[in-house]
């Protein structure tokens, strides 16, 4: 009876493993993608592929590092995400974080985003009590954005490099000479472009026909005029956690 049970359990295990293998093989990776991936990451192991919105995404390990790479179906590389330690962050990023509003929060995870033709971005996942935020920094320590991490999704697909129209590129070059373009995305018919200009992160929004709509930047609470700060402090929201 025991031998029979062991045999049955072994068959079940084989069935589960076969099911997992079938799931993995269900993603058809184009030859061009496989060739590009092999050339970029010759030491990759434990490779698993997934189709995410038309992008071929590989999760793998290389030199002991957990990584993820994004390609289109033609084999063009877009982005690589590397799981790194806090100590591996550029000094400018560590300095900015430790001098910022989240310095007392626990750093749960750190990712490095290498992107085709655009700025390298570092993402710190920080948490305190029930709150979690993703903090995006440029290589020279500029805080680009702070996003509540409500669903625990570690996918940084929204940071894939996007091509800008000539009208938008020309406007940014004229209005913000020397600006570095960090990210761009389409949202509700508008194009939102994140740039670094004069050492600050700006978000520039364009509407129909790529016409400029507005530009905004975040400021620290200490930079807010006293009258505004007092009004906020006396409001129902208080000053426990305000993003301006």
Where are these regions (language model features)?
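Conserved small/polar residues in nucleotide/adenosyl-binding loops
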Residues: 242-244
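Amphipathic N-proximal alpha-helical interface segments
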Residues: 54-81, 121-149, 189-217
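Sec-dependent N-terminal signal peptides
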Residues: 6-10
